[in-house]
Amino acid sequence: MIEIESKFKLSSNITCDNLIAILKSQFVAPISSKHQIDTIFLLPEQVDAPIVPGSKIMRVRDTLDPETSKLRQSLMTLKVEGKAKLVSNEYESTVGDGNAARQILTALGWQEIVTVDKIRLESKTKDYTICIDEVAKLGLFIELEVLAEDDANAGDIQRQMHIFLKNLNIDGKLWTIPYDTSIRNLSIIN
């Protein structure tokens, strides 16, 4: 299975509440809320190289209750970049201790690159998992996700996602760069 995504960065005049009001009629599942803190790791030879198809990225995600900050779960994910942007094979497992997982990756030679801190509201439409992400340092986004068979035409699926996003008539722009790369690029610029 591959994960196919499309992201849309919202203009600063749109709030999360505005967005929920616009999208609510399309939801077919209740909205869940979570605070996700992702620690991203790369192999040493990838640190200064562009992410290309076949690149391997490790992520340790701590999911917290947004109200209490209590840890709900930790996940470790290997992402193998696909041929198209925002398309990857993902291999994921729950881990009992996110800190231990980060230490193991470091001991194996993986280098911690960036941390992504976001509040995610998640629901489903008929066709997609839809996420409203408030990403620290980046702003407010809509992210559409779908799991598809390995031989699915990711380009066609992303085009359909782009049409869905454009039909919402919300101010903003398509965003083709993953959150982790966007935040990393900010730190390189500054």
Question: Which residue ranges define each predicted feature?
Answer:
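N-terminal strand-loop-strand beta-hairpin
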Residues: M1-D127, I170-N190
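Hydrophobic, well-ordered secondary-structure segments
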Residues: E3, F141, Q158-H162
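A generic structural motif
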Residues: L10-S12, L147-A152
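Residues forming anionic-ligand binding surfaces in small-molecule and nucleic-acid pockets
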Residues: T77-K79, K137-E145
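Short alpha-helix boundary/capping segments
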Residues: S93-G96, E149, N153
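A short, sequence-level motif marking secondary-structure junctions
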Residues: T94-V95, V135-G139
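Mixed-charge, glycine-accented linear interaction segment located at domain edges/termini
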Residues: D150-P178
